[in-house]
Curated annotation (Swiss-Prot):
Enzyme class of the recorded protein, top EC level: lyase
Protein's name in the database: Tryptophan synthase alpha chain
Species of origin: Caulobacter vibrioides (strain NA1000 / CB15N) (Caulobacter crescentus)
Pathway: Amino-acid biosynthesis; L-tryptophan biosynthesis; L-tryptophan from chorismate: step 5/5
Catalytic reaction list: (1S,2R)-1-C-(indol-3-yl)glycerol 3-phosphate + L-serine = D-glyceraldehyde 3-phosphate + L-tryptophan + H2O
Catalytic residues as annotated in Swiss-Prot or TrEMBL: 51 (proton acceptor), 62 (proton acceptor)
Pfam families: Trp_syntA (PF00290)
Amino acid sequence: MTKDRIDRRFAALKAENRAGFVTYVMAGDPDAATTLSVLKGLPAAGADLIELGFPFSDPMAEGPTIQRAAQRGLKSGMTLQGTLDLVAAFREGDQDTPIILMGYLNPVLNKGFETFAALAAKAGVDGLIIVDCPPEEADPLSDALEAEGIALIRLAAPTTDDARLPMVVRRTSGFVYYVSVAGVTGVKSADAADVAPAVERLRKASGLPVAVGFGIRTPDQAAAVAKVADAAVVGSALVDEIESAAQLNENVTEKVLLKASELAKAVRSARVGTK
């Protein structure tokens, strides 16, 4: 299974002429049981693919929202192994929705690439995004993941020039993740007019679907990106819901799934009437 789930999902989306809706949540925020409850509810709320962050003490690419989520995850005792356990528990009831782990190199390095890849495949992980692993240094990780059929998904940014792009997309599989705004997650907003040519350029360079994230917070922004990209990724807006619901002692799962559902509807309707 593994990476095939990603390929099948994007093929199905293409057949339906719509972009995918990709959700991001942090494992262990605010606790493991809530994360599992949210994961189980996301597909019915409209998530086509799920990104699951594993907490790290120095998440340098993240804005304040995800940094706080990482701190809450660590405080709840979440680890990389605990994150894999959540995926395995999710897989007991869902064999179709792709799950991509997203995080930083250090915890993966500490496990050992081959050990991590084998455990991730066994748990039912389909892809991995490592924010701080440049392509020049990624071959050992790529080798381990490819041996288990797990996609290594690369990040490309507005600053990725033509000289750099071939290195970025080399050995990328599943999809390319376009960081639509320079800087950290969840702070600035994506501009759909800038996104369209960037998506086209990345599709040509990689031959893969392109998901766009970092800066999509509202249904309107999600719909604008979904018109031109193969998928729209929303993270900070969902994590904000988790944080505020937990602070107010509200039902976290209910609140985050409601927000996900609003965003999913916007993504699904973005191309209605187009061919």
